[in-house]
Amino acid sequence: MEGGKLLGVAHPEPANNIDADLRYDLGQSRMQVDGPVVLNRSAELEPSDSMAIDDVPVEASSQPAPAKQSPALMDTIVEVQKQLKRKRASSGPALAAADKDALVAGCCQELEGLLEYYREVSGHRMQFEVGNLSTNAAIGCLLEESSLGLSKLVDEIYEKLKGMEGVSATSVRSSVLLIGQRMMYGQSSPDADVLEDESETALWCWEVRDLKVIPLRMRGPLSTRRTARKKIHERITAIYSTLSVLEAPGAEAQVNDMRKASLKLSKALNLEGIKSLVERATQKSNIERGAKNTGSTAKEPMQEMVKSNNDTGIIENVDDSQLQKNTSTNEKDTQKAQKQVEKELKQKEKEEARMRKQQKKQQEEALREQKRREKEEAEMKKQQRKQEEEAQKEQKRREKEEAETRKQQKKQQEEAEKEQKRREKEAVQLKKQLAIQKQASMMERFFKNKKDSEKLEKPGGKDSGVQTTDPCTTNKEVVPLVTSIIDSSFSQKENWALEDLRRLQISGWQKLSSYNRSSRWGIRNKPKKEAFKELKLQKTSDNMLEEILSPNEDTCHNLSQENEPDKSANDVDMLPAVELQFHGTNHANPLPTRSIKRKLLQFDKSNRPAYYGTWRKKSAVVGPRCPLKMDPDLDYEVDSDDEWEEEDPGESLSDCEKDNDEVMEEDSKITDEESEDSFFVPDGYLSDNEGIQIESLLDDKDEASSSPPDQCAEVEEFRALLRQQKVLNTLTEQALRKSQPLVISNLTHEKAELLTAGDLKGTSKIEQLCLQVLSMRICPGGATIDLPVIDSSSANAEETNQLNVKSSPAAASAIPDTDLAEIVKVIGSCRDGINKLVESLHQKFPNVSKSQLKNKVREISEFVDNRWQVKKEVLSKLGLSSSPASSKKPKSIATYFSKRCLPPEEAILASPELRLKSKTTQNVNGDTDIPRINLLPSSQ
């Protein structure tokens, strides 16, 4: 037979798989003993094996308990527990140095006693006869309470059992791992080998997994010794944990760890308690064994007698009554002994239950005390938290009050700023009124009769002797002085010439164009972002002339105070003044002006046009050494290149690319609105007070007529001028509200016939020369020519043809003429834009590129009436008839105005000064009607 079968190991595999099974058992044992305290399964204590803790006296024992070996350690533990209770709420050290040293010394002393007692308990080896036991039972008896490693233990058992049949080293090893386990009752390192380690502090001990393998008479002592070893292990573990807490750095402040360690140490049985427990268990087993022995001794004489009679063959007559009597007596004695033993056991159990109850009561009291203290601590923490919350609320309230105060201060500051802005606005309005008055006075001087000019001729010698004064003091006298110089120039008839007037006018236009910011090249006419919310009218020529001729305040300040620094010098370029002289006069007044240089900025790889203009501010951040820094005063997101989009040449910016469905939908919407929403106010309708105030103007005229006749005629002219300005402002606002341009023409002047009149002398000749200068157009030959009247429709067609010829490259000729009829058919059936039209053609001609198709469409068709239509010459070439175009007349802007928005005819006839001619002419493209209004009255 094989060794595996002999040892009772169930291995259905062959013998060569024994090593794998051994490795599996070894791995299981390693996993089980990986913990630091108990390996595999430990023996459990019976309820009757429990013992009182530490200072509780041992009662109900047959012999008095011996004296404690370490009373100093118990006193030290009690004293430590009292100190921990007193210093639980304090922040100082948990133990004094003397108490700590005493506790460490007591623990070490008790640890030595426990190790010695463990050797006494575990030093027993079983005595048995090998022939009377099975192989597994013999191996179990040999490995029980052995401290050797696995290899040495297997060798020792194999030496003793090698005489038996079927025993080998491999079978012994597998049987040891199968029926036995190695327990650790001490303290060992985590890296130690569980099956081979033999350190003394680990207290290794081999035990059988099931006591049924051991003979019956040996089970009682083994169970008692296992209980003793388990109690020793619990005490050693508690002592080691206490020493680790005491030896750890900063252990004086770890009150909770000390309390837990002392509680664990007090719960574990000390050395004296373990000895008492072992002694009682031994007495119990002895009593049970004595009772069993008594019963067996009573039966032995009868068995010997029967045996002897059977052996010798002699049958004696024994009195049956005497035999029964002896038997009953023995049975009574046995029952009595058993009752006595049971009584003692019950009494011991009762005493132990009482002790356990008392111990449980003490533990409950300790827990209640601990809970009470924890509750008090929680209440204190709650109060502290409440106080902190109240402090935080108070702080938040103060912060809120401060925020309210700051808010009120800020509000007051804003109100003060608003008041200041209001005052500044009033000052600006007052300044505007003064400018209007100045303009009126200028017009008044312009319309003065010849008497004023004659008055200016008399003190002519005084003008030559005028001394140059400070330009800052002569700012208000510039405009009247210029007017007087012009009047005096008109009075000198012999000095006037056509070339001189032309040259003077051209030089004036050049100077004015340098100050017109909107005349620079490269300006974006249609930016994506509106520069202004509403159109701002340009200043009058008088205000602009005043601004040009006004001296620079910073220049005057620097001329008067050269050494004094000016903070605004960093923002404005200070340039020298230039004297402005008038041609044909002897009067020269040096007027300082600002000759501002213009700058051209062009960036590489930028699609946007170059910047051309004046930039007079100096940045405090951007400079020659750091040109790539960002100025915080500039907004770099507004004028970024992302907003710029290149427009395709020849594309219409209108809604020409709408689908046919969208156009039909819009027409239906317009029809529905006209039919259903006829009660709505139409676009362009104005209320009673929003139209041209003709009634108020007529009232002014009536008031002027009712004034006394001796009033000056200049007042009437001034009123007429104000009325004209009011009408102009009203028409301008109306045009802005409708987003429609307002063209003001002055072609029908009352003195237009002077241009063609001849044989004029005196003032009429001078007026004719002035009108010729104003109406002339500079040509290469230098002669004055009239612009011919050009039909707008023919000019538009010619420009369209030129654009189409320029935009059609030679690549369009790549399409054969055979496909021209199909292309014309698609163009005639499609009412969409150029992009969708090209898509439709590309589906029919996929071999031709879209760019060639687009060029071909632009070559043979033109965009008319919001759609692409084939040219007539192309249709005639193909022999096709041109489809009649939809003659939908565009709506004029005059249809959006009601009659109340325009002056009545009787008002125009009654007031010659307010005679306004409203003409509507087509613009260059012929798409919309722009109202043209003649501002100045006509004599016709």
From Swiss-Prot:
<dbReference type="GO" id="GO:0033186">
    <property type="term" value="C:CAF-1 complex"/>
</dbReference>
<feature type="compositionally biased region" description="Basic and acidic residues">
    <location>
        <begin position="330"/>
        <end position="429"/>
    </location>
</feature>
<dbReference type="GO" id="GO:0006281">
    <property type="term" value="P:DNA repair"/>
</dbReference>
<feature type="compositionally biased region" description="Polar residues">
    <location>
        <begin position="320"/>
        <end position="329"/>
    </location>
</feature>
<protein>
    <recommendedName>
        <fullName>Chromatin assembly factor 1 subunit FSM</fullName>
    </recommendedName>
</protein>
<feature type="compositionally biased region" description="Low complexity">
    <location>
        <begin position="430"/>
        <end position="440"/>
    </location>
</feature>
<feature type="compositionally biased region" description="Acidic residues">
    <location>
        <begin position="638"/>
        <end position="650"/>
    </location>
</feature>
<keyword id="KW-0156">Chromatin regulator</keyword>
<dbReference type="Pfam" id="PF12253">
    <property type="entry name" value="CAF1A_dimeriz"/>
</dbReference>
<feature type="region of interest" description="Disordered">
    <location>
        <begin position="317"/>
        <end position="473"/>
    </location>
</feature>
<dbReference type="GO" id="GO:0010448">
    <property type="term" value="P:vegetative meristem growth"/>
</dbReference>
<feature type="region of interest" description="Disordered">
    <location>
        <begin position="919"/>
        <end position="940"/>
    </location>
</feature>
<comment type="subunit">
    <text>Component of the chromatin assembly factor 1 (CAF-1) complex, composed of FSM (FAS1), FAS2 and MSI1.</text>
</comment>
<dbReference type="GO" id="GO:0044772">
    <property type="term" value="P:mitotic cell cycle phase transition"/>
</dbReference>
<keyword id="KW-0804">Transcription</keyword>
<keyword id="KW-0233">DNA recombination</keyword>
<dbReference type="GO" id="GO:0006334">
    <property type="term" value="P:nucleosome assembly"/>
</dbReference>
<feature type="coiled-coil region">
    <location>
        <begin position="329"/>
        <end position="439"/>
    </location>
</feature>
<dbReference type="InterPro" id="IPR048800">
    <property type="entry name" value="Cac1-like_C"/>
</dbReference>
<keyword id="KW-0539">Nucleus</keyword>
<keyword id="KW-0805">Transcription regulation</keyword>
<dbReference type="InterPro" id="IPR022043">
    <property type="entry name" value="CAF1A_DD"/>
</dbReference>
<dbReference type="GO" id="GO:0005634">
    <property type="term" value="C:nucleus"/>
</dbReference>
<dbReference type="GO" id="GO:0010389">
    <property type="term" value="P:regulation of G2/M transition of mitotic cell cycle"/>
</dbReference>
<comment type="function">
    <text>Component of the chromatin assembly factor complex (CAF-1) involved in chromatin assembly following DNA replication and DNA repair. Required for several aspects of development, including apical meristem maintenance by regulating the durations of the S- and G2-phases of the cell cycle through its chromatin assembly activity.</text>
</comment>
<dbReference type="GO" id="GO:0010449">
    <property type="term" value="P:root meristem growth"/>
</dbReference>
<dbReference type="GO" id="GO:0006310">
    <property type="term" value="P:DNA recombination"/>
</dbReference>
<dbReference type="Pfam" id="PF21796">
    <property type="entry name" value="Cac1_C"/>
</dbReference>
<keyword id="KW-0175">Coiled coil</keyword>
<feature type="region of interest" description="Disordered">
    <location>
        <begin position="638"/>
        <end position="682"/>
    </location>
</feature>
<keyword id="KW-0227">DNA damage</keyword>
<feature type="compositionally biased region" description="Basic and acidic residues">
    <location>
        <begin position="445"/>
        <end position="461"/>
    </location>
</feature>
<keyword id="KW-0234">DNA repair</keyword>
<comment type="similarity">
    <text>Belongs to the CHAF1A family.</text>
</comment>
